[in-house]
């Protein structure tokens, strides 16, 4: 099977996902320079119901339109809010309800950007889509591999690990070969409206709101006790869903007799008792794990796990690669690390690599302590 990306650019119609940011803007520009037939598409994935537009959708659409006008391409718009609600947001709420800490960006990429958007673009007659993600692709025979972006500070393969090779084969990543300062310089040189626009941060549908204020609109909080590892009650929490492993801020613990000056950290969430377990010190033994169990595994392309494999992994975005052994056991996928891993968090994603190739990953189900707990 010949990859669609290998066709003559002049005969290849590419629709770029235009977010209103600098990365997608430059992606569209680069594709034009490479000779592709380029159009843009702006996705609206969230319906604001209070008029304040936390997602800045109106401003982002205006920026996307300004860029498309500048470089002379058509901009389509599409509303995927229903798909986002059904396939991303409801799962996000279910995970928080279960006391886990999900990552909606990963689901959004799989279900919206590389499914709903891809299908819609193909229905418009596109041969390929393109996005502003900092990743690369490599065609090897019948397979298309997902590679890390060349800029280690911006590599986004962690967020794309659940996108299949067939979808990657239909996608171009023009800025994956560049570093961020180069991208901004290109945008500035060509007078693009997004050249100096700040990168978006956080979850789109929450925007600048406090996370706890947003979450309590949808989920009832269940207050409970805060305990030390010895079982001493030292405070109250407003709901386990507001806390994550390794968290330091917002615990409301202070001025305890004989407690010392070291800050308190979330060590464990006891879902059965609705108790938040905390301890003092950034290096508290309970913060470290030697292994994890993962579920909901997605591989970019099929891999052979008939015997354990030496790989690297990330348990959070921008973490350096961690050496591990991945094996398929009777209870599921288990990754054993060479070094202790801090704040391994159920609900977050673990992503596996073989060198620069992103193999895929899954959701962290549980972490195994580095040292025995009393």
UniProtKB/Swiss-Prot annotation:
Active-site residues annotated for this sequence: 108 (nucleophile), 204 (cysteine persulfide intermediate)
Site (Interaction with tRNA): 133, 348
Region called Interaction with tRNA, residue ranges: 154-156, 316-317
Protein's GO biological process: tRNA wobble position uridine thiolation
Broad EC category: transferase
Primary site of residence: cytoplasm
Keywords, ordered alphabetically: ATP-binding, Cytoplasm, Disulfide bond, Nucleotide-binding, RNA-binding, Transferase, tRNA processing, tRNA-binding
Binding annotation for ATP: 17-24, 43, 132
Gene Ontology cellular component annotations, sorted alphabetically: cytoplasm
Superkingdom, taxonomy of origin: Bacteria
Catalytic activity annotation: S-sulfanyl-L-cysteinyl-[protein] + uridine(34) in tRNA + AH2 + ATP = 2-thiouridine(34) in tRNA + L-cysteinyl-[protein] + A + AMP + diphosphate + H(+)
A GO MF term: ATP binding
Segments of this protein annotated with the region Interaction with target base in tRNA: 103-105
EC number(s) recorded for this UniProt protein: 2.8.1.13
Disulphides: 108-204
Compartments reported by the entry: Cytoplasm
Family listed: Belongs to the MnmA/TRMU family.
HAMAP family in the cross-refs: tRNA_thiouridyl_MnmA (MF_00144)
Functional summary from the UniProt entry: Catalyzes the 2-thiolation of uridine at the wobble position (U34) of tRNA, leading to the formation of s(2)U34.
NCBIfam families: PRK00143.1, trmU
Protein name: tRNA-specific 2-thiouridylase MnmA
Native organism: Pseudomonas putida (strain GB-1)
């Amino acid at each position: 099977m010949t990859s669609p990306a290998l066709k003559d650019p002049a005969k290849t119609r590419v629709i770029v996902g235009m977010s209103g940011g600098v990365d997608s803007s430059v992606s569209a520009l680069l594709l034009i320079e490479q000779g592709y037939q380029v159009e843009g598409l702006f996705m609206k994935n969230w319906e604001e119901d209070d008029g304040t537009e936390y997602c800045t959708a109106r401003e982002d659409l205006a920026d996307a339109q300004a860029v498309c006008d500048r470089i002379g391409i058509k901009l389509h718009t599409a509303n995927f809010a229903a798909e986002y609600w059904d396939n991303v947001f409801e799962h996000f709420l279910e995970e928080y309800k279960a006391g886990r800490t999900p990552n909606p960006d990963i689901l959004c990429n799989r279900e919206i950007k590389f499914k709903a958007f891809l299908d819609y673009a193909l229905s418009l007659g596109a041969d390929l889509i393109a996005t502003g993600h900092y990743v690369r692709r490599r065609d090897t025979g019948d397979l298309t591999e997902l590679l890390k972006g060349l800029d280690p500070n911006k590599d986004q393969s962690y967020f794309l690990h659940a996108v299949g090779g067939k979808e990657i084969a239909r996608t171009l990543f023009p800025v994956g070969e560049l570093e961020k300062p180069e991208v901004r310089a290109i945008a500035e040189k060509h007078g693009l409206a997004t050249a100096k626009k700040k990168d978006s941060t956080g979850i789109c549908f929450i925007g600048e709101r406090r996370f706890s204020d947003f979450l309590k609109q949808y989920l009832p909080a269940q207050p409970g006790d805060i305990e030390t590892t010895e079982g001493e009650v030292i405070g109250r929490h407003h709901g386990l869903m507001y806390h994550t492993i390794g968290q330091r801020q917002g615990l409301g613990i202070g001025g305890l007799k004989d407690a010392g000056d070291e800050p308190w950290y979330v060590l464990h969430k006891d879902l059965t008792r609705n108790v938040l377990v905390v301890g003092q010190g950034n290096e508290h033994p309970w913060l470290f794990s030697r292994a994890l169990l993962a579920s909901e595994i997605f591989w970019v392309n099929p891999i052979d796990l008939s015997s354990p494999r030496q790989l690297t992994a990330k348990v959070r975005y921008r973490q350096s690669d961690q050496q591990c052994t991945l094996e398929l056991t009777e209870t599921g996928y288990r990754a054993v690390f060479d070094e202790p891993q801090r704040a391994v968090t159920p609900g977050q994603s673990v992503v596996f690599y073989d060198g620069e190739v992103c193999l895929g990953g899954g959701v962290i189900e549980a972490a195994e302590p580095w040292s025995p707990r009393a």
